[in-house]
Amino acid sequence: MSSYKYYDLIRKPIITEKTTALSEQNKYAFYVDKFAAKLTVKKAIEEIFKVKVKKVNILNVKGKNKRFKGIIGTQINRKKAIVTLEKDNNIDFAGGIK
């Protein structure tokens, strides 16, 4: 699989207080395509960020019910991947921001 398809597979990183605390344990969270499998997520992360992946956990997140201007709607369902890296690897999302 070429690298441009890997970029389509990984939607965006999840940067919250909880995932920032996980990054100290070499775990990083990403929203991925809803048809993504563990093996393809592992290959995509290794190809894009040039790191060695130890383990991938995937979970489906159900969309919340929301009200907008009196109309009840539903947010989209998402798939979340929590990627554990090998010991000496890390991903820097900030990229030199001070």
From Swiss-Prot:
In terms of superkingdom, the source organism counts as: Bacteria
Q: Which gene encodes it?
A: rplW
Q: How does it assemble?
A: Part of the 50S ribosomal subunit. Contacts protein L29, and trigger factor when it is bound to the ribosome.
Question: Its function?
Answer: One of the early assembly proteins it binds 23S rRNA. One of the proteins that surrounds the polypeptide exit tunnel on the outside of the ribosome. Forms the main docking site for trigger factor binding to the ribosome.
This one is known as Large ribosomal subunit protein uL23
* CC annotations in GO: ribonucleoprotein complex; ribosome
Q: Could you say which protein family the record assigns here?
A: Belongs to the universal ribosomal protein uL23 family.
Asked if the keyword Ribonucleoprotein belongs to this entry, the reply reads yes
Q: Which InterPro entries match?
A: Nucleotide-bd_a/b_plait_sf (IPR012677), Ribosomal_uL23-like (IPR013025), Ribosomal_uL23/eL15/eS24_sf (IPR012678)
Keyword tags? Ribonucleoprotein, Ribosomal protein, RNA-binding, rRNA-binding
Against PANTHER family, the record matches this protein to: 60S RIBOSOMAL PROTEIN L23A
Q: Which GO terms describe its molecular function?
A: rRNA binding; structural constituent of ribosome
Q: Name one GO biological process term.
A: translation
Instruction: Identify the species of origin.
Output: Rickettsia canadensis (strain McKiel)
